[in-house]
Amino acid sequence: MTGKTTKSTSDVPAEAAGAIRVPRLDQQLCFALYSASGLMTKLYRPLLDPLGLTYPQYLAMLALWEHAPSTVGALGEALGLDSATLTPLLKRMEAGGLITRRRDAADERRVLVEPTAKGQALRSRIKDVSLALACSVPLEPVEAKALHATLTHLVAGLRNAVTEDASADAEALVSGST
């Protein structure tokens, strides 16, 4: 040892060390979206518990009330879920008597999903859930509508980016330029 003290790079501010400045966690769009999503799910839980629904089941029922019967693939696409996530969800809903699943007579490879009478009966009670949630969200109706439009635009752009990335990855694999 020479007796000299040296500063480690961890003692030097990032800007002085020439490091790239990374935005703080609370400045990250992804974290704001992640936090908002988690909190919305928590707000829904006490509203959906009396109906015997989880938040993902609620979303599945909303999609099925709009388009039933639906193929498992179309439902997964509407919800943004892959079959490994969707199939167990549908099995629980079927066991609870909310939906039926059956093979498509026109194409045995396809499974059709639709609400049962019990599942349809929940529809009238969902309006109360929507109203209660609207009262819990700290946004004026016009703000909520604007946020919804912005998020819908964001989701469409992200889906496009994910699709383009997947296509580029597939092209690279086929051409051998990975």
Model-derived features: positions:
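A structural signal for well-ordered alpha-helices, especially hydrophobic packing surfaces
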Residues: S37, R123, V155-L158
